Amino acid sequence: PLPVVVVAYPITYDGHPDSYPLHIASKILSDGQSSRIYRKLVYDTGLALTAFGGGNIVEHPNLFYAVAIVQPGHTTEEVAQALIGEFERFRNEPVSDRELQQSKNQFARDYITSRETNQQKASHLAHAVVIHQDVRTADGEFDIFTGMTPADVQRVARTYFTPDTRLVMTILPKAGANRSVR
């Protein structure tokens, strides 16, 4: 086992106006190997074996988090500072038009593929009624997401990714955990 670093920030609930740009932020920061966090920590610096995260946007306020498994030869402090640095960069620099368009394309793909069966369609309708109290959001969210701007995304980053609310957690392997199992 290797050390793990988690950086997290409290965020709002699903259906809040800020939840939509937070979804976009999640795509840009932590959705896959082309995300900012993965590229920076795995490809560019080699600080982490892998890195991932996302916004846990549900019916109650929750967390936006990033997780990185520390590459041997590096410290948890280096990894924590790199993760924090990416959140700070996200707060201070607007996302590029290319990043925003890529995240919208990912959203459109997810939107379509998550509505292929009748059960999936019913689930989206139920979510709209129960969580949003408005059945129109089942389809109306598509227009909200495609209308996002870099300023919308940066505004929520500045609102939620603040040093005062940041949680940094380091998980260390138990002593002797690196021994081979026989």
Can you say where each PLM-predicted feature lies in the sequence?
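Bilobed periplasmic-binding protein-like "clamshell/Venus-flytrap" ligand-binding domains
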Residues: 154-171
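Generic solvent-exposed, charged/amphipathic alpha-helical segments
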Residues: 25-26, 38, 84, 154, ...
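M16 family metallopeptidases and their MPP-like homologs
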Residues: 1-13, 39-147, 166-173, 179-182
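His/Glu-based metal-binding/catalytic segments typifying zinc-dependent metallopeptidases
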Residues: 1-34
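Short beta-alpha junctions and helix-cap segments that line functional grooves
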Residues: 24, 52-53, 141, 155-157
